[in-house]
């Protein structure tokens, strides 16, 4: 009997250690302070800039090892805003994003790596019904600080460049008219749940 109690006690202690170290925190984007900005070359002359302002999803951080964290972000494609309503309507149409058929884009991480300047987050971006691997260069997390909602908030900035034609977006337009490279800048203010 003493042996069983001792074995049970040792098993409890040996399992409690790793479980305590593997605590995670769940963070969600603050929609008022998070966005995905994009820029693309127009007629090889100037950049057209815009943003998606309705960002959702979760970031689950491993408190002991950030490289074991996961990212699952959803972008409402219908929230596209370039400051020109006619262009925004065209971007939502089948000519570009086809938001009626593909109203959301998602990014799901596959790995997180520490770098000298922050993090590299690898994952799969699904946009316009096409999924491609994407690598984000991430600065952060910053904070946490207490937000107006009395929850801890942290910040992340991420950048990447994608090919619009790889995602089947506006494939009929040559690169001389609309650049193929689209620069993305992601600003996330996330609140701990």
Put a short name on every predicted segment.
Residues 1-8:
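Bacterial N-terminal signal peptides that target proteins for export
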Residues 1, 17-20:
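N-terminal targeting/docking segments
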Residues 20-193:
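Low-complexity, acidic/polar, glycine-enriched regions of mature
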Residues 8-18:
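Bacterial N-terminal signal peptides
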């Amino acid at each position: 009997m003493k042996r069983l109690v001792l074995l049970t006690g040792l098993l409890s202690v040996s399992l409690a250690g790793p479980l305590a170290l593997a605590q995670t925190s769940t963070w969600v984007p603050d929609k008022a302070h998070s966005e995905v900005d994009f820029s693309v070359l127009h007629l090889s002359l100037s950049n057209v800039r815009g943003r998606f302002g309705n960002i959702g999803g979760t970031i689950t951080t491993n408190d002991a090892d950030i490289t074991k964290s996961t990212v699952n972000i959803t972008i409402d494609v219908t929230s596209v805003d370039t400051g020109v309503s006619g262009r925004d309507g065209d971007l939502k149409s089948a000519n570009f994003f086809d938001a009626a058929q593909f109203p959301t884009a998602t990014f799901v991480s596959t790995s997180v790596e520490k770098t000298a300047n922050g993090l590299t987050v690898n994952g799969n971006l699904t946009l316009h019904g096409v999924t491609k691997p994407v690598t984000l260069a991430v600065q952060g997390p910053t904070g946490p600080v207490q937000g107006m909602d009395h929850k801890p908030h942290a910040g992340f900035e991420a950048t990447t460049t994608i090919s619009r034609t790889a995602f089947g977006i506006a494939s009929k337009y040559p690169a001389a008219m609309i650049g193929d490279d689209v620069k993305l800048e992601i600003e996330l203010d996330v609140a701990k749940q």
